[in-house]
Swiss-Prot record:
Organism per entry: Streptococcus equi subsp. zooepidemicus (strain H70)
Top EC group: transferase
Active-site residues (renumbered): E91 (proton acceptor), C340 (s-methylcysteine intermediate)
Similarity comment: family membership: Belongs to the radical SAM superfamily. RlmN family.
Principal place of residence: cytoplasm
Record-given protein name: Probable dual-specificity RNA methyltransferase RlmN
InterPro entries documented for this protein: Aldolase_TIM (IPR013785), Methyltransferase_A (IPR040072), RlmN_N (IPR048641), RNA_MTrfase_RlmN (IPR027492), rRNA_lsu_MTrfase_RlmN/Cfr (IPR004383), rSAM (IPR007197)
SUPFAM superfamilies noted in UniProt: Radical SAM enzymes
Cofactor note: Binds 1 [4Fe-4S] cluster. The cluster is coordinated with 3 cysteines and an exchangeable S-adenosyl-L-methionine.
Radical SAM core domain residues: 97-335
Amino acid sequence: MKPSIYGLTRDELIAWAIDNGQKAFRATQIWDWLYRKRVQSFDEMTNISKEFLAILKDSFCINPLKQRVAQESADGTVKYLFELPDGMLIETVLMRQHYGQSVCVTTQVGCNIGCTFCASGLIKKQRDLNSGEITAQIMMVQNYFDQRGQDERVSHVVVMGIGEPFDNYQNVMTFLRTINDDHGLAIGARHITVSTSGLAHKIREFANEGVQVNLAVSLHAPNNELRSSIMRINRSFPLDKLFSAIEYYIETTNRRVTFEYIMLNKVNDGVEQAQELADLTKRIRKLSYVNLIPYNPVSEHDQYSRSPKERVAAFYDILKKNGVNCVVRQEHGTDIDAACGQLRSNTMKKDRQKAATART
């Protein structure tokens, strides 16, 4: 399968065009066709010579994704299941917000982080997505707007789908530079958030990139014992290493870090844990924010359940009394396969059942 041209940054596309005997402005024209006019075929690029179009077609495809499923929620959330060229499946989510249209993208096929509450890790990592496959997710949603004649654009991006973004670092960075490019989609860096489960060394590397993209950290527990029991990654990057990297990030970028904290009933949602969390984040309080996330139950992880509203409220109150900037996250798509990885997992189960039935 040819690589997607979406996998190139504008500078890389210019270099490729020059290597193929073209002037730099040809690459700029192609970039405009891809991201401003958003064509679906190289043949639609009417100001590109037939000879150069032939080279383009021999070298690249445009969009490598095929839509398998689209579930639309009553609140306007759309959950997509896309098929990759090798037949593997990934999820992408469109969330309609009061401030714009936000898309959550996937960076890996499966996940090896091993969080015990998460649907994404039910199927182990099979491979990284390349940068073109990540960018194509944004283009699929933008095409959805365009085809409906909706004067809307993808304005915000969260890199929080299946997989650990910092375990696919270079492809994610290429993706970020592509969607942020002022000559293309021009999605503002401050409208983009990358979430990590806590790869401390990559947080430091990210701090040195000089990008204005937001950082979120999946914390989910305020002490090492509990965090190691629900997030295997903590055994490699315990809280002292993680927070050292976070402090370095804040000192280097002067940017706020968001902590994601999923509320698991009688696991991590007690008043003691709330106080521990307040104490843990005290040193970086001015440049940190806690996002309390209602749990979407996963049948394979039935040892966990959603925290009742009164426990969430008590937890929230303790954080606020300690001066912690925090919010209970607004839910999206609760009437569809809401948990990250759930649509993919359920579809793969159905595919296996169909295959088994066909054999009998």
